[in-house]
Amino acid sequence: MPVSAPGPLPTVVEQSGRGDRAFDIYSRLLRERIIFLGTGVDDAVADALVAQMLFLEAEDPEKDIQIYINSPGGSVTAGLAIYDTMQQVAPDVVTICYGLAASMGAFLLSGGTKGKRLALPNARIMIHQPLGGAQGQAVDIEIQAKEILYLKETLNGLMAEHTGQPLDKISEDTDRDYFLSPAEAVEYGLIDRVVDSSGDGGIITES
């Protein structure tokens, strides 16, 4: 099932010659190549998103995949698994922020196909460095500190590549929580445009 926040799950009933068939709303949207990331990012969420992208690639390797993102972020390694798959699959990956894309959510937003990274007008985007903590013997703390530093450098380097910002600016801006409006995110290079109210029903059509 597409990944979204828990709560009542609407169903859609379709009629055919073989009778009525009910779909949960996210499965129905998956048929339109729309995926939702509406939770924090962990291994289970990453597995679900990766599986959906691979399925949609197998269905049609030339048609865009759309990922709607409303996520506070989460596990860096799980997020990188999603990111690597976004870069690997043949279809272009359209990313659309609705609500909030923070931390790993913002990173995934920026990792969509260039020219196809979008945000709704009242969305918020926040970037910062990876969070982590360690306890135990000094050698264990040192190992964890090195890993956090490695992940920070990896994420900053990739974000610099996707935004066009200098690496030192990315490092400085992500030292603390850094919030942006959609217009500011366009200027920063995190996204490419803000979705207007064109009455297209929320489906981002291919240009």
UniProtKB/Swiss-Prot annotation:
Question: Which sites are catalytic?
Answer: 103 (nucleophile), 128
The name on file for this protein is ATP-dependent Clp protease proteolytic subunit 1
Indicate where this protein resides in the cell: Cytoplasm
* Recorded catalytic activity of this chain's protein: Hydrolysis of proteins to small peptides in the presence of ATP and magnesium. alpha-casein is the usual test substrate. In the absence of ATP, only oligopeptides shorter than five residues are hydrolyzed (such as succinyl-Leu-Tyr-|-NHMec, and Leu-Tyr-Leu-|-Tyr-Trp, in which cleavage of the -Tyr-|-Leu- and -Tyr-|-Trp bonds also occurs)
Cross-referenced HAMAP family: ClpP
Q: What does this protein do?
A: Cleaves peptides in various proteins in a process that requires ATP hydrolysis. Has a chymotrypsin-like activity. Plays a major role in the degradation of misfolded proteins.
Q: Which NCBIfam families match?
A: clpP (TIGR00493), PRK00277.1 (NF001368), PRK12553.1 (NF009205)
Enzyme Commission number(s) from the entry = 3.4.21.92
Do you know which Pfam families this protein is assigned to?
A: CLP_protease (PF00574)
Any one cellular-component term (Gene Ontology) = cytoplasm
Q: Which SUPFAM superfamilies match?
A: ClpP/crotonase
Please provide the record's keywords in A-Z order: Cytoplasm, Hydrolase, Protease, Serine protease
Q: What family does this belong to?
A: Belongs to the peptidase S14 family.
**What domain of life?**
Bacteria
List, in alphabetical order, the GO biological process terms annotated in this UniProt record.
protein quality control for misfolded or incompletely synthesized proteins
Single annotated GO MF: ATPase binding
The protein's assembly and partners: Fourteen ClpP subunits assemble into 2 heptameric rings which stack back to back to give a disk-like structure with a central cavity, resembling the structure of eukaryotic proteasomes.
